[in-house]
């Protein structure tokens, strides 16, 4: 698994790119599911108006962002979808990387079951942050958890591919930060890793 020092960089933009291709792994009730990270978004706490911790705002919900890098920040979006963020940087520097999409690897049948996705397009199984959490069995119970236990971790194992940067999604309120290219996507080189 990735060691703690990997997550302690204060450059969340670069780290959001470096996470692409790494395998995200969960163990829930003894069952393993995993997928390669293929889409991320960077949120740079103090100055980023799209970030929950803009201007060092601290709330009950976003307290996990102030933990040391390598912690999980989970929150609920629209009251129903759980979203996983990887906290980065030193303690009290509220940077995070949102995991937006994965390519399923281990436990794909279990992911389909969790998502109730039988006989539906496979490329839509884990192509959104809420879908990732549902497929991997990630919930608010994982909030503040260190990403170095069998329950939830990121492996050193990595696939390569072509990286694309675009504006982040759903942040029209973020003024001058609305269009910064801090959303990163990986198109894997191995065609066998691409969902059809």
From Swiss-Prot:
<comment type="similarity">
    <text>Belongs to the DNA glycosylase MPG family.</text>
</comment>
<keyword id="KW-0227">DNA damage</keyword>
<dbReference type="Pfam" id="PF02245">
    <property type="entry name" value="Pur_DNA_glyco"/>
</dbReference>
<protein>
    <recommendedName>
        <fullName>Putative 3-methyladenine DNA glycosylase</fullName>
        <ecNumber>3.2.2.-</ecNumber>
    </recommendedName>
</protein>
<dbReference type="GO" id="GO:0006284">
    <property type="term" value="P:base-excision repair"/>
</dbReference>
<dbReference type="GO" id="GO:0003905">
    <property type="term" value="F:alkylbase DNA N-glycosylase activity"/>
</dbReference>
<dbReference type="InterPro" id="IPR003180">
    <property type="entry name" value="MPG"/>
</dbReference>
<dbReference type="GO" id="GO:0003677">
    <property type="term" value="F:DNA binding"/>
</dbReference>
<keyword id="KW-0234">DNA repair</keyword>
<keyword id="KW-0378">Hydrolase</keyword>
<dbReference type="InterPro" id="IPR036995">
    <property type="entry name" value="MPG_sf"/>
</dbReference>
<dbReference type="InterPro" id="IPR011034">
    <property type="entry name" value="Formyl_transferase-like_C_sf"/>
</dbReference>
């Amino acid at each position: 698994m990735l060691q703690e020092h990997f997550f302690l960089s204060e450059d969340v933009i670069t780290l959001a790119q470096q996470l692409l291709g790494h395998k995200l792994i969960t163990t829930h009730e003894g069952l393993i599911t995993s997928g390669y990270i293929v889409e991320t978004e960077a949120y740079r706490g103090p100055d980023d108006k799209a970030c929950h911790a803009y201007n060092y705002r601290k709330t009950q919900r976003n307290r996990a962002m102030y933990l040391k890098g390598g912690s999980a920040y989970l929150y609920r979006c629209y009251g129903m979808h759980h979203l996983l963020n990887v906290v980065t940087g030193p303690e009290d520097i509220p940077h995070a990387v949102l995991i937006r999409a994965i390519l399923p690897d281990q436990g794909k049948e279990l992911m389909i079951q969790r998502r109730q996705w039988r006989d539906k397009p496979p490329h839509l199984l884990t192509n959104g942050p809420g879908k990732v959490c549902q497929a991997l069995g990630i919930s608010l119970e994982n909030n503040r958890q260190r990403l170095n236990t069998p329950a939830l971790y990121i492996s050193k194992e990595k696939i390569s591919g072509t990286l694309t940067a675009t504006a982040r999604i759903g942040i029209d309120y973020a003024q001058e930060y609305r269009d910064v290219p801090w959303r990163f996507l990986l198109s894997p080189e191995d065609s066998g890793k691409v969902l059809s």
